[in-house]
């Protein structure tokens, strides 16, 4: 009896350790925001699972412009991934950010190095680089968008 209890306790401890190695986070991605910071640092080759739901309007007030996380079956040059549906859920890993200050005007210009990838409604993606994970909409003209996607992000802590 004592041995069985020890084995059960050991099994629970191992299960707890395995569960602790997985991080599950819910992120709201507004359709009218350029990018949403997940707060998650990833490494190159790490697999991350995404499950998204919700509806966006790619043109507020136009019911014909509604789409889910897989996007609207249209491609334009005004989107980060031109070979994927307009309005689809996408991601990027920001590798580095450089801030340059103009000596004459004093204005700061931000330049970032990032790797982009498609997500859609559900996918498992191997991270293309080490850096910070952001989620966004596959569209560059976002001022007239409405709605949001709710995205569950599951990562293995490495």
Question: Which residues does each PLM region occupy?
Answer:
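Acidic, Ser/Thr/Pro
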Residues: 21-158
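Bacterial N-terminal signal peptides that target proteins for export
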Residues: 1-9
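Bacterial Sec-dependent signal peptides at the C-terminal "C-region" and cleavage site
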Residues: 10-25
């Amino acid at each position: 009896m004592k041995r069985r209890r020890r084995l059960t306790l050991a099994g629970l401890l191992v299960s707890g350790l395995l569960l602790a190695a997985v991080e599950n986070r819910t992120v709201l991605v507004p359709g009218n925001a350029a990018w949403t910071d997940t707060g998650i640092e990833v490494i190159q080759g790490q697999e991350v699972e995404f499950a998204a739901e919700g509806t966006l309007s790619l043109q507020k007030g136009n019911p014909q412009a509604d789409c889910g996380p897989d996007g609207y079956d249209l491609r334009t040059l005004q989107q980060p991934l031109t070979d994927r549906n307009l309005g689809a859920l996408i991601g990027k890993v920001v590798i580095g950010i450089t801030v340059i200050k103009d000596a004459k005007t004093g204005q700061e210009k931000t330049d970032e190095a990032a790797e982009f990838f498609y997500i859609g409604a559900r996918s498992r993606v191997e991270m293309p680089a080490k850096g910070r994970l952001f989620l966004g909409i596959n569209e560059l003209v976002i001022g007239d968008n409405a709605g949001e996607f709710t995205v569950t992000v599951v990562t293995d802590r490495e």
